């Protein structure tokens, strides 16, 4: 493998791990890089999950050490997401690259809308006490799991919205929960992608090294870093990814 590709995968991995630990949506960077390096979109989605698992193991352990992650609650929340993840991953194996491209594009647009609609309103928490998981929360997490099991890009925003708006968590603890959800549920979809040969292990493992380092630094300094610059960066990358999808299709 050319050393330039290794450098690109490591640097982009660091950025993805850093941003995803603080916020969400940086998986668009991974998908953009993988597609630019020639991977079909479904294989790019499968390959991405290697880094997702390893990155979120790192961030979850770091948040846990800082007493920002309630493992018991996190395990309960993971159940509906696992159900949705299995459905979404199996669905992605049944559709063509063209259909997956369309779903991916819709996900990108939706993520862009979420970034524009006053994110500071729902990223700061509701200021209320933590609520127990209701039936509506369960259903929303299943739906988020379906999206995560297939497209994945931007799924963290849906997790954060449920945890912050629906349950009353503050942003840092919601991010800690979001990371644990990814760590606990992504292996289920990864196995399905592996069974269908839709994973590039070399790209995925190299990218994961950068993810791990980025996640560690972000989780360690989470309370000191702002998210304004990150949102602008993600909007730029959403546009780039949409262009790549359109070019591949037409």
Each model region followed by its residue ranges:
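Small-residue hotspots at the loop-to-helix junctions and early N-terminal turns
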Residues: 42-46, 175, 179
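Selected transmembrane alpha-helices and immediately adjacent juxtamembrane segments
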Residues: 1-40, 125-175, 205
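Selective hydrophobic functional segments
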Residues: 46-99, 186-236
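Transmembrane helix-loop junction
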Residues: 36-37, 43, 65, 89, ...
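Transmembrane helix exit motif
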Residues: 58-66, 105-130, 240-250
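Residues within membrane-spanning alpha-helices of integral membrane proteins
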Residues: 6, 49, 104-108, 112, ...
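Hydrophobic alpha-helical transmembrane segments in multi-pass integral membrane proteins
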Residues: 143-153, 189-197, 204, 241-250
């Amino acid at each position: 493998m050319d050393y330039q590709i290794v450098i690109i995968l490591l640097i982009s991995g660091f950025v993805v791990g850093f941003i995803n630990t603080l916020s969400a949506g940086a998986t668009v960077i991974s998908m953009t890089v993988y597609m630019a390096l020639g991977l079909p979109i479904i294989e790019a989605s499968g390959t991405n999950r290697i880094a997702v698992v390893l990155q979120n193991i790192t961030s979850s352990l770091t948040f846990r050490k800082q007493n920002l992650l309630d493992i018991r609650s996190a395990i309960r929340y993971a159940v509906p997401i696992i159900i949705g993840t299995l459905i979404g991953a199996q669905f992605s194996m049944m559709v063509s690259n063209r259909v997956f491209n369309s779903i991916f594009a819709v996900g990108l647009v939706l993520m862009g809308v979420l970034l524009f609609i006053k994110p500071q309103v729902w990223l700061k928490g509701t200021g209320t006490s933590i609520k127990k998981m209701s039936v509506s929360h369960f259903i929303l997490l299943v739906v988020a799991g379906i999206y995560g099991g297939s497209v994945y890009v931007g799924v963290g925003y849906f997790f954060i919205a449920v945890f912050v708006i629906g349950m009353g968590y503050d942003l840092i603890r919601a991010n800690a929960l979001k990371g644990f959800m990814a760590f606990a549920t992504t292996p289920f979809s990864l196995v399905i992608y592996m069974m269908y040969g839709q994973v590039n292990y070399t790209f995925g493992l190299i990218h994961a090294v950068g993810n791990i380092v980025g996640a560690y630094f972000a989780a360690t300094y989470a309370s000191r870093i702002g998210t304004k610059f990150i949102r602008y960066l993600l909007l730029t990358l959403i546009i780039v990814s949409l262009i790549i999808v359109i070019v591949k299709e037409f």
